[in-house]
Amino acid sequence: AVLALCATDTLANEDCFRHESLVPNLDYERFRGSWIIAAGTSEALTQYKCWIDRFSYDDALVSKYTDSQGKNRTTIRGRTKFEGNKFTIDYNDKGKAFSAPYSVLATDYENYAIVEGCPAAANGHVIYVQIRFSVRRFHPKLGDKEMIQHYTLDQVNQHKKAIEEDLKHFNLKYEDLHSTCH
């Protein structure tokens, strides 16, 4: 029943969220852009490698990932709705298992974000660390998964102290998370 509730398009459903955000009023203008999911609490998400979310100005979302064998690249499209630190994602048919409410628990906007969500694809609950994907810092060849993995690991290492400090608020350590892109 909780999964069904979590998959609805409502920001009012608090049943999905287990933690209070450190950023109650997310600045969506600063959050917009591309983010790579580096690691998360759900082992189920490890089958989706180097997941990249691109949040755009018109509430459109384009997400790309590679399968666990690193062979098939998939693109899914959806819409987002932000309110406070929470947002919902409503993907098209191909991405429905990821349509869910999410909450930004912590972010410095420029380098990393810690997000909590309730997608069915993560067995109903996940906390994950995202790394800001900036072409100013990195410009991989299209589809070059190894370059994206290297970039992600490098960015995690550069900002690990701050990430670890924020994860402590949620009783987590980075090394306890399941890697999804390094």
Swiss-Prot record:
Residues 1-12 form the signal peptide. SUPFAM superfamilies: Lipocalins (SSF50814). Glycans are attached at N72. The keyword Signal applies. It is found in: Secreted. InterPro entries: Calycin, Triabi/Procalin. One of its GO terms (cellular component) is extracellular region. This is Allergen Bla g 4.
